[in-house]
UniProtKB/Swiss-Prot annotation:
Database matches in PROSITE patterns: RNA_POL_BETA (PS01166)
Official protein name in the record: DNA-directed RNA polymerase subunit beta
Example of a GO cellular component annotation carried by this entry: DNA-directed RNA polymerase complex
PANTHER family found in the cross-reference section: DNA-DIRECTED RNA POLYMERASE I SUBUNIT 2 (PTHR20856)
Family the UniProt entry places it in: Belongs to the RNA polymerase beta chain family.
CDD domains: RNA_pol_B_RPB2
EC number: 2.7.7.6
């Protein structure tokens, strides 16, 4: 078994019973793959597939001019490399993007050429087509300096859908069937039955029309329409009555209206008897071909074809006419013998199309098309060309209508065709096939579709959404180019004169900047990032709206299994509309979600893994992942629990075709991080998975002692840790960078064999939490590719660590944990367990105003030196300064308009030369309620503006850092080269060299060490080949130095050129403040099982309940929070955490008494290999075992995977191992060792009963009381009512509302009430008066008229009612 560098240091003991057959796929794959297919940047132009940008270009080009003599063709496109890297874009507020250039060809044809067109001229040119934002390696985009995520959209797949209204439309409760053809782009086509069973169609939800109008419009005659939808009965007219062709199936179940006889005249069915199977057999036995029917049997039947008089050519009766006595007489007159009628019955062959034809008043194709034109364009005159153009554009034009590959596949599958490809527009037979299926549904054959089935909903990913926007931009460009192409020849234009890239840029910018699906990335912790990128939303353009979405769409559907998580979804109005991809889910080429299954052949489970979509899955019998399997892979049980088409049943093993890959297959990343999820109620699990995303990264992350084994995958895939790109040896490491000398076999020839990782230090995330990376390797460590080198935010030794492991006791404590409150020990705060660092970014810009430029300076009048004390000579705060609310961070003055001066002032000015009052102080100050330490300052200066000292110093520091990286690389490169050189030179014969090396001397190591390395190149060797080698090495070193110098120059140029700033901005300064937040009452905390609460009190450690060995509890929770919420998982987690810590203490005690390594090995083997998944401890050296044991002192980490976790029996085994009888007795534990006798910290008395105690991974959430509370005495007031504003952002007051007024009224506190409603609210004069009185020390209140009363009076007057106040 292979362990990575970090896994060896701390192995997580897994209780999984099942072996891993399929690794969890890369969690960000959907985003990254989708965008790379959109760009196809690393594919040669000739080999690009028709998708993404390539598809957009080929769909719009070639563009042909109106006269047809000029056309613009698309050749290929290329993307340039971005000007700034990701970090620079974030600092400067730029978009991380790449310029798109398309090579286009302008072809001009000769107008004079008499026959076929001749090419006169071809011009080819690269044209700039706008900027395309690039995806970062972690699946996000940097737009205007902030990281954003494009969320995937779950929408209705294009294709054809059949449904009914569930009897809701008509009062009778009759089911009205309908069908809808949805294209990817273009007009929707609906077909629907009305309560009278007439079939209508409508285009784009406009007015409905009989469907036969559409059939006529596509060129069918009434006869053809009837022939398509009905079978015919053939009659031969006799002198009396008629003969009807005998078709057995059509008679079964009918009631005979007359005696039915065979050829001899023997009665087989008597009149008024129902015809049954025996009668039919008798008729068939009698070889009946025709049945004689009386005349009235024909009446009321409908003719299937036009009946024409053979002699005169006159139409006697039209198709779809009813046969009456008059019609029969006419037919006999014209001596017509054979007629065909429509066969209909009430059961399974309704006359729907026939009745629709009767309603339809149009005569022929033209009339039908005109009717459609009038419905689409009411009020416009229908000219022949316009009618034709509109009809063709509706469904037959490739520009306006696109079914897409998916739509065509879904359509063909639904109408029962074998091939899944075909034209992308609608065809006549598509419309016919749809109507046929709809009529069959009405006839009672077939099933309607389930729109919530994941086979009918598909996912649109980033790539596809961006492509649609890009195409929309290109189509706008196409219109403009068409206009100008006519002048291309006469004005001798080049392609770049024709194409204006603005529409494309604006479409792309609008999509990435303000689309509903482009969201500000949730970056609170690594899990929230990864979940945000795996989110699937049903909202957004072309999707549902919150208000209109019903219960069915939001509900969990059987097809969600393994594709979409049934647990993780927001609470509130979006519930069920926003989902998360399941752990193993994957998109197929059509955008449908697939999930992996293991193939089962003859009741034997194989290792073959197939990805099945929701539709394919419905055809198979699938066993669950926990089905018992023997060693050879056979299914053991007689009956196996399995699913088929969404139904669960027990079947015999021979019927099983597939089996789940893993028990955690059905849940998302967040839900799979909850241990004992199977013991939690679903509602609480939902809260648990949502709250893990809000956990604030702690200062010292701590791995959860009870995890699920997926923590490592999440940490690595989120990109928050640093992974080794290539294996090698750690050459240098400090807090900010790691240098690795790459293994020879992994280094590419001619490339630097050095990897340098600059770590992210104290950087602000989107949510103002702190992102900081810490190295976990030492110099000299050997690392392999993919090993974790540094931990990021919320990771510990390469595992996700969202909170801290707390010693928890479940017991009430003086009412301080009433209603989910949390009681916490002061020790937790003192040890900084939940202390987090938050980084605030404060900006100030100096603009060019009408009155002159604003200036960033230290020279500000009317400010005491104390206030300027933290600023440097440029007026910018020092790094490391500790600042509080109101302190100046950046000094800035703004010119103020010239005021009219009195002659006296003018004189004073002239004497003292005072200019100070021309400017006002607009410095950047620390906002109220904030204090912290300045950790970074960035200064950006516009091109052509003089840089101040501070800006120059920042650039110099950055260059120094970069030079350090280059020197490290050079040092290692040269070191390697000189080592190779020494091996080559030793033992060679020299012709001469430095330090008077004699000719013919053999070079030895001592001689080389005595020389400076660079002088080695001066040695003249006798062997020509060796001399050539020496020269080659010298050249390669010089080449490398030259390359590094160039790179340094490039960097310097980039840093010293002016910055791109918004118009009118001369200088911008960003100051970053680090704010330390300790845990305090009012902060929200939660476990992973939806058990949330608010800290109510922080209790001195000496008052907390403690155990017999003096160890106090960290957190006291209310036991009443468990039974009604049904999240029992937290109790099991506490028990297992107790065992984990107990084992850790035992290992610590063994290390303390310096046990033999062998004894350690035995104990560790007992822990790891007695149950659950076995670990290969044999392969560990003694040193590695020792390091492992040292890392386990704080607790042996356990993994209890979702739905495959630790059993009760395994947990008691671990508790027995952790707490042998002597320890258990000392702590006065119960027999099952999960409850302990606790003592009251205040009295020292033992509590009456033993208490459940153990360790739980507890999180501090991003709802911090510091961000929510604020205080105000005076501040801004509303303009109209003069009442204080509300809310923290406005620095507002607390609303004293209607009910609070009632409370004071009820209490009779009249003065308090008067004060509340006047001087403390909106009595303007009263407010100032109170302030004045307070200053004078005279505590009197004069309440006046509240301003809002005046507003009321004015409003009443505006209604025309005169209202006046009598003042006495």
């Amino acid at each position: 078994m292979q362990y990575s560098f970090t896994e060896k240091k701390r192995i997580r003991k897994s209780f999984a019973k099942r072996s891993i057959v399929h690794q969890v796929p890369f969690l960000l794959a959907t985003q990254l793959e989708s965008f790379s297919t959109f760009l196809q940047a690393d594919v040669l132009p000739a080999q690009r597939k028709s998708e993404g940008l390539q598809a957009a270009f080929t769909s719009v080009f070639p563009i042909v001019s109106h006269n047809g003599f000029a056309r613009l063709e698309f050749v290929s496109y290329a993307l340039s490399s971005p000007a700034f890297n990701i970090k620079e874009c974030q600092q400067r507020g730029l978009t991380y993007c790449s310029a798109l250039r398309a090579k286009v060809r302008l072809v001009l044809l000769d107008k004079e050429s008499p026959s076929k067109p001749v090419v006169k001229e071809v011009k080819e040119q690269e044209v700039y087509m706008g900027e395309i934002p690039l995806m970062t390696p972690t699946g996000s985009f940097v737009i205007n300096g902030t990281e954003r995520v494009i969320v995937s959209q779950l929408h209705r797949s294009p294709g054809v859908f059949f449904e009914h209204d569930k009897g809701k439309t008509h009062s009778s409760g009759k089911l009205l069937f309908s069908a809808r053809i949805i294209p990817y782009r273009g007009s929707w086509l609906d077909f629907e039955f009305d309560p009278k069973d007439v079939l209508y169609f409508r285009v784009d939800r406009r007015r409905k029309m009989p469907v036969t109008i559409l059939l006529k419009a596509i060129g069918l005659t009434p006869e053809q329409i009837l022939a398509n939808f009905f079978v015919f009965d053939n009659f031969t007219l006799m002198d009396e009555g008629a003969q009807m062709e005998f078709v057995p199936e059509r008679l079964r179940g009918e009631v005979a209206r007359f005696d039915i006889t065979d050829r001899e005249g023997k009665v087989i069915v008597q009149k008024d008897k129902r015809i049954n199977a025996k009668h039919i057999r008798d008729l068939e036995a009698a070889k009946t071909k025709y049945i004689s029917v009386p005349e009235d049997y024909l009446l009321g039947r409908v003719l299937a074809k036009n009946v024409v008089d053979g002699d005169t050519g006159e139409v006697i009766a039209n198709a779809n006419d009813e046969i009456t006595e008059g019609v029969l007489d006419k037919l006999r007159e014209a001596k017509i013998k054979e007629i065909q009628t429509l066969y209909t019955n009430d059961l399974d062959q309704g006359p729907y199309i026939s009745s629709t034809l009767r309603v339809d008043e149009t005569v022929d194709k033209t009339a039908a098309r005109i009717a459609i034109y009038r419905m689409m364009r009411p009020g416009e005159p229908p000219t022949e060309e316009a009618v034709e153009a509109l009809f063709n554009r509706l469904f037959y034009s490739e520009d306006a209508y696109d079914l897409s590959k998916v739509g065509r596949m879904k359509f063909n599958r639904r109408v029962g065709r074998d091939e899944i490809t075909g034209p992308m527009t609608l065809q006549d037979d598509d419309i016919l096939a749809t109507i046929k299926i709809l009529v069959e549904l009405r006839n009672g054959k077939g099933e309607v579709d389930d729109i919530d089935h994941l086979g009918n909903r598909r996912v649109r990913c980033v790539g596809e959404l961006a492509e649609n926007q890009f195409r929309a931009g290109l189509v706008r460009v196409e219109r403009a180019v068409k206009e100008r192409l006519g002048q291309a020849e006469s004005e001798n234009l080049m392609p770049h004169d024709l194409i204006n890239s603005k529409p494309i840029s604006s479409a792309i910018r609008e999509f990435f900047g303000s689309s509903q699906l482009s969201q500000f990335m949730d970056q609170t912790n690594p899990l929230s990032e990864i979940t945000h990128k795996r989110r699937v939303s049903a909202l957004g353009p072309g999707g549902l709206t919150r208000e209109r979405a019903g219960f069915e769409v939001r509900d969990v559907h059987p097809t969600h299994y393994g594709r979409v998580c049934p647990i993780e979804t927001p609470e509130g109005p979006n519930i069920g509309l926003i989902n998360s991809l399941a752990l193993y889910a994957h998109l197929n080429e059509y955008g449908f979600l697939e999930t992996p299954y293991r193939k089962v052949v003859d009741s034997k489970v194989t290792d073959q893994i197939d990805y099945l979509s929701a539709i394919e899955e419905g055809r198979y019998m699938i066993a669950q992942a926990n089905a018992a399997i023997s060693n050879d892979g056979s299914l053991v049980d007689e009956l196996v629990s399995s699913r088929e088409a969404g139904e669960t049943m027990m079947v015999t093993p021979d019927r099983i075709q597939y089996m789940d890959v893993a028990p955690s297959q059905i849940v998302s990343v967040a839900a799979s991080l909850i241990p004992f999820l199977e013991h939690d109620d679903a509602n609480r699990a939902l809260m648990g998975s949502n709250m893990q995303r809000q956990a604030v990264p702690c200062l010292r992350p701590e791995k959860p002692v009870v995890g699920t084994g997926i923590e490592r995958t999440v940490a690595v895939d989120s990109g928050t840790t640093v992974q080794a790109l290539r294996g090698g040896v750690v050459d240098y490491v400090d807090a900010g960078r790691i240098v690795i000398r790459v293994n020879d076999d992994e280094a590419v020839a001619g490339e630097v064999g050095v990897d340098i990782y600059n770590l992210i230090k104290y950087t602000r995330s989107n949510q103002n939490t702190n992102i900081n990376q810490r190295p976990i390797v030492k110099m000299g460590d050997k690392v392999a590719r993919g090993d974790v080198l540094a931990d990021g935010a919320s990771t510990d030794l390469g595992e996700l660590a969202l909170g801290q492991n707390m010693l928890i006791a479940f017991m009430p404590w003086n009412g301080y944990n009433f209603e989910d409150s949390i009681l916490i020990s002061e020790r937790v705060v003192a040890d900084d367990r939940y202390t987090s660092i938050h980084i605030e970014e404060l900006n100030v810009v100096a603009r060019d105003t009408k009155l002159g430029p604003e200036e960033i300076t230290r020279d500000i009048s009317n400010l005491a030196e104390v206030q300027l004390g933290r600023l440097d000579e440029s007026g910018i705060v020092y790094i490391g300064a500790e600042v509080e609310a109101g302190d100046v961070l950046v000094g800035k003055v703004t010119p103020k308009g010239e005021t009219q001066l009195t002659p006296e002032e003018k004189l004073l000015r002239a004497i003292f030369g005072e200019k100070a009052s021309d400017v006002k102080d607009t410095s950047l100050r620390v906002p109220s309620g904030m204090s912290g330490t300045v950790i970074d300052v960035q200064v950006f200066t516009r091109e052509g503006i003089q840089r101040d000292k501070r800006a120059q110093q920042i650039i110099d520091d950055e260059l120094k850092r970069y030079r350090l990286d280059l020197n490290d690389q050079l040092r290692i490169v040269e070191g390697d080269a000189f080592q190779r050189l020494a091996r080559m030179l030793v033992g060679k014969v020299a012709n001469g060299g430095p330090k008077k090396l004699a000719k013919g001397t053999k070079i030895d190591q001592a001689y080389l060490e005595d020389l400076d390395h660079y002088h080695w190149f001066d040695i003249r060797l006798a062997d020509d080949e060796a001399a050539a080698q020496l020269e080659a090495i010298k050249n390669s070193i010089e080449e490398k130095r030259h390359q590094f110098d160039l790179a340094f120059e490039e960097k310097r140029k980039k840093l010293t050129q002016g910055d791109e700033l918004p118009p009118g901005v001369l200088k911008m300064v960003k100051v970053y403040l680090a704010v330390k937040r300790r845990l305090q009452p009012g902060d929200k905390m939660a476990g992973r099982h939806g058990n949330k609460g608010v800290v109510s009190k922080i209790v001195p450690v000496e008052d907390m309940p403690y155990m017999a060995d003096g160890r106090p509890a960290d957190v006291v929770l209310n036991p009443l929070g468990v039974p009604s919420r049904m999240n029992v998982g937290q109790v099991l987690e506490v028990h297992l955490g107790w065992a984990a810590k107990g084992l850790g203490w035992r290992i610590g005690e063994m290390l303390a008494r310096q046990t033999k390594i062998e004894e350690l090995r035995v104990f560790l083997t007992k822990i790891y290999n007695e149950s659950g998944r076995a670990e290969d401890l044999e392969s560990f050296s003694d040193d590695e075992i020792l390091e492992l044991a040292k890392n386990l002192r704080e607790g042996v980490p356990f993994a209890t995977p979702v739905f495959d976790g630790a059993t009760e029996e395994e947990m008691s085994k671990m508790l027995d191992l952790a707490f042998p009888d002597d320890i258990a007795e000392q702590l006065d534990m119960n027999p099952s060792k999960n409850q302990v006798r606790l003592y009251d910290g205040r009295t020292g008395e033992p509590f009456e009963r033993r208490v459940t105690v153990g360790y739980m991974h507890y999180l501090k959430l991003h709802h911090l009381v510091d961000d929510k509370m604020h205080a105000r005495s005076t501040g801004p007031y509303s303009l109209v009512t003069q009442q204080p504003l509300g809310g923290k952002a406005q620095f507002g007051g607390q609303r004293f509302g209607e009910m609070e007024v009632w409370a004071l009224e009820a209490y009779g506190a009249s003065y308090v009430l008067q004060e509340m409603l006047t001087v403390k609210s909106d009595d303007v004069t009263g407010r100032t008066k109170v302030y004045e009185n307070l200053v004078k020390g005279d505590h009197v209140i004069d309440a006046g008229m509240p301003e809002s009363f005046n507003v009321l009076v004015k409003e009443i007057r505006s209604l025309g009612i005169d209202i006046d106040l009598d003042r006495n």
